[in-house]
């Protein structure tokens, strides 16, 4: 007997009444409960991008290196010499807040599958994490669980986590962010896509068995949190990295045959989304026979089978007649494998169960015909007052050295060593620059002379405070800083992926933030020649009406060639000259300093001149490639003083303890405005460099050729950070504050906790 579809059931499926009316119009009848479940997940924000798609279409997505842009499992760019890179970034925010270890672990698993589905072997991962106020009772619990989940899954897969960023802000108290990025390498002429082509071709299920975990995960990821958050724990998937490792190796072996026509990861919305999307891309229909799906639990219904988000599963369209070849390879790797359907010419998506059709839907309304909203937009009403804020009226700290120590201890600025020590960043020995620097650099793990000198630079980042105060400018800063980080290691930016994390799009101010950030990313990408080739949107990041800062995370990929000629972030040799490429403006709007010292999050983000930015980057990139520099470090959170301090102490400690993990410096800074503003302001387009004295004249000439200003500041040496007329602090004290920032958060939690998982 068919269950009646009531307004309550429609609402439980996350559908608006007007959306249900559209379903009735598409079908000309009442849907079954199973069909309603299919529409629910396919029309969720997570799968349909119904609020964001109209804005995303404005991104630049093509370029001379782009082999695959948005719309597939991952973007692909040409690295030259027959080699390509596939990469993407995705969010797993809502699951990670509910169940931090499994939420983060399965986020890593999902992004790895997106990349190797394209035919690529993953070689490097990064992540961008956001947590609440360090003093919030849940922050330490989430931090420990998320980091353990990322490390646990990635380490078992043998894919190094080579970098990333972690930041803390009260807006994330009820909604942490876990954005995972993976890059893989593949032959440029062997890209696999998620398409159901070839009428009559078999549809095959490969991987782990299907259980009840994760049902309606996509719908949950498209809703705000409330007091019932803990009840959503069953919608979080459970990952098995060892199964995923088998799946990875089996897929890569299958790609060496002629058996694979199309392949798609079963991620959000599971078998439903993967099969519908493949049918949509192929312009065909699909018949699924759910009796053939390998099941882990007894008594599962068609509804549960279709909407399960059990992990480590792939849907594959094989060439007709190649079923046994696929089966033999999958069984060799101890994977479940079954023919569960056929490609049809009907243009319809049908699910069969025990001889009956339990779902019969047209493909188009589930894909391109899904709702597309032009939601109302309006600037945030608080912005005029925030922009009018005058920082000049604030008192200047009596002790600038003490202010620097406090900034260095802020978890957003402090050393992330506690985090990356839990990740295996040395597996496969691909790292050319260790974690903790501006950008990760990985060698291409391929045995070919033409590739031996190629490396890839990777950077992720965004400043959510900037994006709140000025979404357009803040998003441009995100792209510019990633490009600047890549320039610091001698890389040439190629392309970006993004992960756009926002609050409730039904609020006009949130939709305005989103649209402005998209516009900012697009304009900056056009300026840098870095098309957007993949990405993800995560909306409804709110808890009981409180939204996060707009957080459009950017992940950028650059080419480093030759990879032997790169650069580190830390001062190297006593006597080296220290210089600033860029200028001194003392812009503190939206800065970490303003928040830390004065409790203010106001003003405007620093101005950004893209022509100046490109000149600064080109100067440093060319200097690195010419071997002129000992170090190069981007000035960002905390400003010039923090950049100087980090350059003094971001050293690996020698195993024999023969020298300390720091070196001092003495500089003289011209102060055009207040000293604290110049020291801690986060002016754009600045890179701190050090270089041997004999290279100084050549470097200044190079900067003039590129049109970038250079200010000579001082020299490396000693055991103190000395800024003439401002501060003098032992580097050992700076290092102690900097290294203890995150461990202090965990100690505070342990001291007053006594419970494993605070409510």
From Swiss-Prot:
Gene Ontology CC: cytoplasm
HAMAP family tied to this protein: PurL_2 (MF_00420)
PANTHER family for this protein: PHOSPHORIBOSYLFORMYLGLYCINAMIDINE SYNTHASE SUBUNIT PURL
Residues reported to bind Mg(2+) 1: 90, 536
Quaternary assembly: Monomer. Part of the FGAM synthase complex composed of 1 PurL, 1 PurQ and 2 PurS subunits.
Positions that bind Mg(2+) 2: 114, 265
Gene: purL
Enzymatic reactions: N(2)-formyl-N(1)-(5-phospho-beta-D-ribosyl)glycinamide + L-glutamine + ATP + H2O = 2-formamido-N(1)-(5-O-phospho-beta-D-ribosyl)acetamidine + L-glutamate + ADP + phosphate + H(+)
Molecular function via GO: ATP binding; magnesium ion binding; phosphoribosylformylglycinamidine synthase activity
Enzyme Commission (EC) number: 6.3.5.3
Stored InterPro entries: PRibForGlyAmidine_synth_PurL, PurL_linker, PurM-like_C_dom, PurM-like_C_sf, PurM-like_N, PurM-like_N_sf
Protein localization: Cytoplasm
Function (record text): Part of the phosphoribosylformylglycinamidine synthase complex involved in the purines biosynthetic pathway. Catalyzes the ATP-dependent conversion of formylglycinamide ribonucleotide (FGAR) and glutamine to yield formylglycinamidine ribonucleotide (FGAM) and glutamate. The FGAM synthase complex is composed of three subunits. PurQ produces an ammonia molecule by converting glutamine to glutamate. PurL transfers the ammonia molecule to FGAR to form FGAM in an ATP-dependent manner.
Annotated binding of ATP, by residue: 49, 88, 498, 535
Organism whose genome encodes this protein: Anaeromyxobacter dehalogenans (strain 2CP-1 / ATCC BAA-258)
The keyword DNA damage is annotated on this UniProt entry: no
Catalytic residues (UniProt): 46, 92
Family: Belongs to the FGAMS family.
Organismal lineage: Bacteria, Pseudomonadati, Myxococcota, Myxococcia, Myxococcales
Gene Ontology biological-process entries: 'de novo' IMP biosynthetic process
Gene3D superfamilies the UniProt entry points to: PurM-like C-terminal domain (3.90.650.10), PurM-like, N-terminal domain (3.30.1330.10)
Official protein name in the record: Phosphoribosylformylglycinamidine synthase subunit PurL
Amino acids binding substrate: 91-94, 113, 237, 309-311, 538
Primary localization: cytoplasm
Key word Methyltransferase present: no
């Amino acid at each position: 007997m068919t269950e009646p579809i009531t307004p309550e059931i429609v609402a439980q499926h996350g559908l608006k009444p007007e959306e249900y009316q559209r379903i009735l119009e598409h079908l000309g009848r009442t849907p079954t409960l199973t069909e309603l479940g299919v529409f629910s997940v396919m029309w969720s924000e997570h799968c349909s991008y119904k609020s964001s798609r109209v804005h995303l279409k404005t991104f630049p997505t093509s370029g001379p290196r782009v082999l695959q842009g948005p719309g597939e499992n991952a973007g692909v760019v040409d690295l030259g010499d027959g080699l390509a890179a596939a990469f993407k970034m995705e969010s797993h925010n809502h699951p990670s807040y509910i169940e931090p270890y499994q939420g983060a672990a399965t986020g890593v698993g999902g992004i790895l599958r997106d990349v190797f589905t394209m035919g690529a072997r993953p070689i490097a991962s990064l992540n961008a994490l956001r947590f609440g106020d360090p003093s919030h009772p849940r922050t330490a619990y989430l931090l420990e669980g998320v980091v353990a989940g990322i490390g646990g899954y990635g380490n078992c897969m043998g894919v190094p986590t080579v970098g990333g960023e972690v930041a803390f802000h009260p807006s994330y108290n009820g909604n942490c962010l876990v954005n995972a990025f993976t890059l893989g390498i593949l032959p440029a002429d062997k890209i696999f896509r998620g398409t159901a082509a070839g009428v009559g071709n078999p549809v095959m299920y490969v991987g782990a068995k299907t259980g009840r975990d994760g049902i309606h995960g996509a719908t949950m990821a498209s809703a705000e949190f409330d007091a019932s958050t803990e009840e959503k724990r069953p919608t979080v998937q459970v990952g098995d990295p060892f199964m995923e490792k088998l799946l990875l190796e089996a897929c890569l072996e299958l790609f060496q045959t002629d058996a694979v026509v199309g392949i798609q990861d079963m991620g959000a919305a599971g078998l439903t989304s993967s099969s519908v999307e493949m049918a949509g891309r192929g312009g065909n229909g699909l018949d699924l026979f759910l009796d053939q799906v390998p099941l882990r639990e007894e008594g599962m219904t068609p509804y549960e089978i279709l909407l399960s988000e059990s992990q480590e599963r792939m849907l594959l369209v094989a060439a007709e007649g190649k079923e046994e070849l696929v089966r033999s390879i999958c069984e060799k790797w101890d994977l479940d494998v079954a023919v569960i359907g056929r490609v049809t010419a009907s243009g319809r998506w049908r699910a069969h169960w025990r001889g009956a059709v339990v779902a019969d839907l047209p493909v188009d309304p589930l894909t391109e015909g899904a709702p597309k909203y032009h939601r109302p937009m309006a600037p945030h009403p608080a912005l005029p007052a925030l922009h009018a804020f005058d920082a000049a009226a604030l008192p200047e700290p009596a002790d600038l050295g003490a202010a620097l120590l406090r900034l260095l201890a802020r978890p957003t600025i402090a050393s992330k060593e506690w985090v990356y020590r839990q990740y295996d960043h040395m597996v496969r020995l691909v790292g050319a620059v260790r974690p903790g620097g501006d950008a990760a650099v990985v060698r291409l793990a391929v045995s070919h002379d033409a590739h031996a000198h190629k490396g890839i630079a990777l950077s992720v980042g965004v400043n959510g405070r900037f994006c709140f105060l000025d979404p357009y400018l803040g998003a441009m800063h995100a792209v510019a800083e990633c490009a600047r980080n890549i320039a610091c290691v001698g890389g040439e930016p190629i392309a970006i992926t993004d992960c756009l994390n926002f609050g409730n799009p039904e609020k006009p101010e949130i939709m305005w933030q989103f649209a402005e950030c998209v516009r900012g990313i697009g304009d900056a990408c056009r300026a840098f020649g870095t098309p957007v080739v993949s990405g993800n949107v995560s909306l409804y990041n709110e808890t009981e009406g409180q939204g996060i800062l707009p957080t459009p995370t950017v992940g950028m990929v650059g080419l480093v060639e030759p990879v032997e000629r790169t650069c580190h972030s830390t001062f190297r040799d006593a006597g080296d000259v220290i210089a600033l490429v860029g200028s001194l403006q003392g812009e503190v709007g939206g800065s970490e300093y303003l928040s830390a010292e004065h409790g203010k999050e106001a003003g405007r983000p620093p101005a950004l001149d893209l022509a100046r930015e490109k000149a600064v980057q080109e100067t440093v990139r060319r200097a690195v490639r010419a071997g002129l520099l000992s170090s190069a470090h981007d000035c960002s959170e905390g400003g010039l003083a923090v950049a100087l301090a980090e350059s003094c102490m971001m050293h690996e400690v020698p195993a024999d303890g023969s020298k300390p993990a720091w070196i001092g410096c003495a500089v003289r800074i011209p102060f055009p405005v207040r000293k604290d503003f110049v020291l801690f302001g986060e002016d754009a387009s600045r890179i701190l460099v050090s270089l041997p004295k004999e290279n100084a004249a050549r470097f200044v000439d190079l900067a003039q050729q590129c049109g970038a200003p250079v200010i000579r500041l001082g020299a490396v040496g000693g055991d103190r950070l000395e800024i003439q007329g401002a501060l003098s602090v032992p580097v050992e004290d700076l290092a102690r504050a900097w290294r203890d920032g995150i461990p202090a958060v965990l100690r505070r939690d342990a001291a007053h906790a006594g419970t494993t998982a605070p409510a």
